[in-house]
Amino acid sequence: MTGRSCLTIVLAAGEGTRMRSSLPKVLHPVAGQTLLAHVLTAAPSGPGTSLAAVVGPGHEAVADEARHVRPDVMTFVQHERLGTAHAVLAAREAIARGADDLVIAFGDTPLISADTLARMRAPLQAGASLVVLGFHAADPTGYGRLIVDNGRLTAIREQADASADERSITLCNAGVMAFDGKTALQIIEKIGNANSKGEYYLTDAVSIVRESGLTAAVIETSEDEVRGINTKAQLAEAEQVMQARLRKEALDAGVTMVAPDTVFLAADTSFGKDVTIEPYVVIGPGVTIADGAVIHSFSHLVQASIGRNASVGPYARLRPGTSLGEGARVGNFVETKAAVLEAGAKVNHLTYVGDAHIGANANIGAGTITCNYDGFGKYRTEIGEGAFVGSNSSLVAPVKIGAGAYVGSGSVVTRNVPDDALAVGRGQQTVREGWARRFREMKLLAKKPKTG
């Protein structure tokens, strides 16, 4: 919307009692981000834009999340919950600054897109004073109907007040609105509370606009995009819709998914070219996967960076702070945390690598554990380039294994190992010839029944 300034207000003051949760409704996650984060991310950004969030009293966590997602956000408190128009006026100070466009969105509609919010501003540039977002409902029962005449919105009719003909209308009110900034404040301030609940409803703005001889318009979108979240069941439905959207975007970008419906992505997952994701993979927030990488089945990744042609899994868990270099391998039943594996490093089986740096082309044998925690603090393990750690070894941090060094299988390493050295830290093997035969004979003799 070139040349037009815009203020977006996101209403996030609801208690969300039907969620039956101590967590504020808008802080529940969909695809690894809070409901509020999705809406704030979709809001217009850049030069000429401003953003406000209206939160409930005592909901500092909601305000903190808003500032975390969009540091430019202004936060306002709605001290009494007296309807949507009352909530908007909690941000009166921001509205009074006089942006060209005012967009009002809801913090519990995580599927709303930036494109839809941008489309709502176009009729304002063409002269409309109010734009309402609508959708065609598969079952419109309970929704306010949008009454349109010759392309102009004339009314929002609630279910209880609708005639039989009006109830047959499937175009429904999504709640999201955009106002011409020059007249927005005076229109919203005219909204009264002469209704059974004594609340101030934003939907009444339509009649005020019409009575003032101004124009109201409708922009349509899909029903999925404007799903509001009020229950855990609706949260699960939104997750399903979002995952379908993310999978399609990934497939369209060239990611190979053997069984897409079994793969779960985060909203911020980033893929390179020729990435392959096998069935039953869960990717949490903060994951980037570079060209040619393969994520094998039953792997779980969060806040991890996967390098070119790297391989993960099957049955691998990559926790925050994991970084795999080009061609690195993390195999089956391996867990990593705050671990850097340089190019070509291999951790193929049954291993825990935490608070560690593994040099290029190092090989970590099956059953190796970096013992990084002593009950009070975490300590680092450094493994040099080309080092070889034998199976079933314990590396007691803080410890350094030098470049090219070998650690014998079954070792407990408590001191630094120099470059190209061999470290063996285990008991010496003892062999007793014939011991097993004598042991068996003794046990069998003891089992024979005693005779009187």
UniProtKB/Swiss-Prot annotation:
Residues the entry annotates as binding Mg(2+): D108, N230
The compartments listed are: Cytoplasm
Query: Which InterPro entries does this chain map to?
Result: Bifunctional_GlmU, GlmU-like, GlmU_C_LbH, Hexapep, Hexapep_transf_CS, MobA-like_NTP_Trfase, Nucleotide-diphossugar_trans, Trimer_LpxA-like_sf
- Pfam families to which the protein is assigned, alphabetical: Hexapep, NTP_transf_3
The record's section on PROSITE patterns has: HEXAPEP_TRANSFERASES (PS00101)
What are the required cofactors? Mg(2+)
Residues folding into a coiled coil are none
- This enzyme's EC code(s): 2.7.7.23, 2.3.1.157
Which residues bind acetyl-CoA per the record?
A: A366, N372, Y373, S391, S409, R426
Tell me how the cofactor is bound: Binds 1 Mg(2+) ion per subunit.
In the record, biological process GO terms are:
cell morphogenesis; cell wall organization; lipid A biosynthetic process; peptidoglycan biosynthetic process; regulation of cell shape; UDP-N-acetylglucosamine biosynthetic process
Chemical reaction(s) catalysed: alpha-D-glucosamine 1-phosphate + acetyl-CoA = N-acetyl-alpha-D-glucosamine 1-phosphate + CoA + H(+); N-acetyl-alpha-D-glucosamine 1-phosphate + UTP + H(+) = UDP-N-acetyl-alpha-D-glucosamine + diphosphate
Q: What is its main location?
A: cytoplasm
Under CDD domains, the record lists:
GT2_GlmU_N_bac, LbH_GlmU_C
Keyword entries, A-Z: Acyltransferase, Cell shape, Cell wall biogenesis/degradation, Cytoplasm, Magnesium, Metal-binding, Multifunctional enzyme, Nucleotidyltransferase, Peptidoglycan synthesis, Repeat, Transferase
* Enzymatic class: transferase
The pathway that the record names for this protein is: Nucleotide-sugar biosynthesis; UDP-N-acetyl-alpha-D-glucosamine biosynthesis; N-acetyl-alpha-D-glucosamine 1-phosphate from alpha-D-glucosamine 6-phosphate (route II): step 2/2; Nucleotide-sugar biosynthesis; UDP-N-acetyl-alpha-D-glucosamine biosynthesis; UDP-N-acetyl-alpha-D-glucosamine from N-acetyl-alpha-D-glucosamine 1-phosphate: step 1/1; Bacterial outer membrane biogenesis; LPS lipid A biosynthesis
Positions of the UniProt region annotated as Linker: 233-253
* Annotated stretches, region: N-acetyltransferase: 254-452
One molecular function GO term is:
magnesium ion binding
Q: Where is the active site?
A: H349 (proton acceptor)
An annotated GO cellular component: cytoplasm
Task performed by this protein: Catalyzes the last two sequential reactions in the de novo biosynthetic pathway for UDP-N-acetylglucosamine (UDP-GlcNAc). The C-terminal domain catalyzes the transfer of acetyl group from acetyl coenzyme A to glucosamine-1-phosphate (GlcN-1-P) to produce N-acetylglucosamine-1-phosphate (GlcNAc-1-P), which is converted into UDP-GlcNAc by the transfer of uridine 5-monophosphate (from uridine 5-triphosphate), a reaction catalyzed by the N-terminal domain.
- What family is reported? In the N-terminal section; belongs to the N-acetylglucosamine-1-phosphate uridyltransferase family.
Q: How does it assemble?
A: Homotrimer.
Protein name according to UniProt: Bifunctional protein GlmU
